[in-house]
Amino acid sequence: MVLDFGARAQDFLKRITTLSADLAAHGRTRALALQKLHRLCQAEVRRLKTRYTLATVKLALSKYRNAIRAVEPDHLVLRPRKMRSGQRFSYLALEPEETRSLNAAYHERIHRDQSNLIPLDPEAFIQTALELLASDRYLQKGMGLMALTGRRPAEIFFSASFSLPKKKLPYPAVIFDGQLKTRQAPGTSFEPYPIPVLADPKKLIQALDRLRSLKSFPSPEAVNTTTGPQLPKYVSAAFGSLELPWKPGHLRSAYGAICCHKFKPKNQTDDIFLAQILGHKLLGPNASLSVGQSYKDFYISKV
């Protein structure tokens, strides 16, 4: 099931907006407004926890913060606070021990996955992706673009735009604009950047234009709600097998593995190159290398 927290986030935003004037005041008025804001946030987090797993709640709270940030980038909800005990907390986040538990589970999964990599035949992968690209069914064409450019579903179906580089690069490339999941953190960049591609760049630009004419979406959430239930079975049918079923995220991982194999400069590690081509470099140095660990699912088995 694909969950869309956009509407709930907007409803929560309306509820805390009524406090804006008092939060901008001074003295007792501001103190009381801060207390009410804290109670509203705590109640919303508790409500989410009764319905969803911690991982899903963490995702939902990220949606809430993004909705607030889009309207008021400096809202107090977004600022870390300090208790009298000295402990730091956020109005709209999980408890520190809950976050640590999720992070531990994440690192355990990464260790397990990287201890059992999936073999990948680059030529077979690219050929399958090109066949999908030639389809006039929007989901198949989108899968082809995802595989050949390494972009996420919501980027391919909604936010991405491709253009040709002005200068020749050492690999086939397009300039990609429309990166999602940048976390909107301090130091984050939103600039378009070059990405290597696994097919003719002009062909990919034309395919993206054709895809948008086949079907358009109003938002990333609409993409995830519509394509989320279908993509796993279609991706696995096209690229996986009964023994090794594929997930949509594997397309991005396979793209990264092939690009490292074909295009990575010899004086760079895989981590640095992946951070560049997957857009993790935009997150800033603290997050860029760690995020790339989620995309190391394959090893090149044939050349």
Predicted regions and their residues:
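Non-catalytic DNA-binding core/recognition domains of DNA-processing enzymes
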Residues: 1-93, 156, 249-250, 254, ...
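Flexible interdomain linker/hinge and immediately adjacent N-terminus
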Residues: 76-124
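Basic, Lys/Arg- and aromatic-enriched nucleic-acid-binding interface segment
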Residues: 118-149, 153
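Hydrophobic transmembrane helix bundles of membrane-integrated enzymes that assemble
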Residues: 143, 157, 232-240, 256-263, ...
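C-terminal catalytic core of tyrosine-transesterase DNA break-rejoin enzymes
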Residues: 144, 246-283
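Conserved tyrosine-mediated DNA breakage-rejoining catalytic core shared by Y-recombinases
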Residues: 158-203
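Active-site/catalytic core of tyrosine-dependent DNA strand-transfer enzymes
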Residues: 196-255, 260
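Catalytic-site neighborhood detector that most strongly recognizes the C-terminal catalytic loop/helix
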Residues: 264, 276-303
